[in-house]
Amino acid sequence: PQMLSANERLKNNFNILYNQIRQYPAYYFKVASNVPTYSDICQFFSVMYQGFQIVNHSGDVFIHACRENPQSKGDFVGDKFHISIAREQVPLAFQILSGLLFSEDSPIDKWKITDMNRVSQQSRVGIGAQFTLYVKSDQECSQYSALLLHKIRQFIMCLESNLLRSKIAP
């Protein structure tokens, strides 16, 4: 039998997953305290912070953060979220989101942010998609459980509502 892709499995099981997800209560994420500022992470080369390895090397326009002990043990199959922020608001947006990005409850084990000091204003990432959140499955065969899908959805909604509440422009 032919193996279905993760996307095909999600489509085929949409109604089942949707009904399972609806049964979960709202999820509240513990916000990390004493998080570095955007200016701090732009100056780091490599540092461990709250279980995340932060790397900012000169050959890249991105600052990468990767959880040392990932929560999701599945494979990365290309699923990601981009959050685009007006260039001049990236430092403030990072300040607003960093407590969640570094949260021990975050379902995101790996993310990156553009180092705006290293990128051309006219480049794709200089204009938008400054945050990239990488999502990994939590089951075999790159499948997502209903619980993880719920947690990811709640996390993204929390990030968005924090940005909206702070009047951060896309």
Curated annotation (Swiss-Prot):
Superkingdom assignment? Bacteria
Subcellular location as annotated: Secreted
Q: What is its EC number?
A: 4.2.3.-
Which keywords accompany this UniProt record?
Lyase, Plasmid, Secreted, Virulence
Q: Which residues form the active site?
A: 82, 112
Record GO terms (molecular function)? lyase activity
Cystine crosslinks? none
Per the record, what is one GO cellular component? Answer: extracellular region
Q: What does this protein do?
A: Catalyzes the removal of the phosphate group from the phosphothreonine in the mitogen-activated protein kinases such as MAPK2/ERK2, MAPK3/ERK1, MAPK8 and MAPK14 in an irreversible reaction, thus preventing the downstream phosphorylation of histone H3. This epigenetic modification results in inhibition of the transcription of a specific subset of pro-inflammatory genes, and ultimately to a reduced immune response against the invading pathogen. The diminished immune response enhances the bacterium's ability to disseminate and multiply within the host.
For this chain, the family text in UniProt reads: Belongs to the phosphothreonine lyase family.
Q: What is this protein called?
A: Phosphothreonine lyase OspF
Species per Swiss-Prot/TrEMBL record: Shigella dysenteriae
Gene encoding this polypeptide? ospF
